């Protein structure tokens, strides 16, 4: 159960899929994943329920939104950025480019990459603004 006084002060959204069901954003991998994960196999109603942008209001916490130049979900970030702007939610948006090679989906999890360190340091700096 969620504590009544819980207040999320900031969130990070990294290399994510934020909107489901857009025909132009649909791909076989995502469609198959939704069929497996959602009880009714990814009906339009279920897809609407998992759309992040459905839940963005002016009360949404500040966002660190990140993707990478070769992330297969890269087109999702600008869609969410548009919603954040419309709702006047404070956010930082970064699309990372590699210093030595092209960066792909969730590159920031590879701690051996200097580019991952750069991304994670920036994300930590973002959160420091919201720590007491």
Provide a role label for each language-model segment.
Residues 1-132:
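Alpha/beta-hydrolase superfamily serine-hydrolase fold, recognizing
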């Amino acid at each position: 159960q969620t504590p009544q006084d819980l207040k999320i002060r900031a969130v990070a959204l990294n290399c994510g899929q934020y909107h489901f069901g857009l025909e132009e954003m649909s791909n076989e991998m995502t469609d198959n994943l939704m069929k497996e994960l959602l009880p009714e196999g990814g009906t339009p109603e279920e897809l609407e329920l998992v759309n992040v942008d459905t839940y963005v209001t002016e009360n949404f916490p500040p966002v660190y939104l990140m993707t990478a130049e070769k992330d297969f979900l890269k087109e999702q970030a600008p869609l969410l950025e548009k919603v954040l702007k419309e709702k006047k939610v404070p956010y930082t948006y970064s699309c990372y480019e590699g210093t030595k090679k092209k960066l792909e989906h969730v590159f920031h999890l590879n701690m051996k990459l200097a580019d991952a360190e750069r991304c994670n340091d920036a994300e930590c700096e973002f959160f420091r603004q919201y720590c007491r």
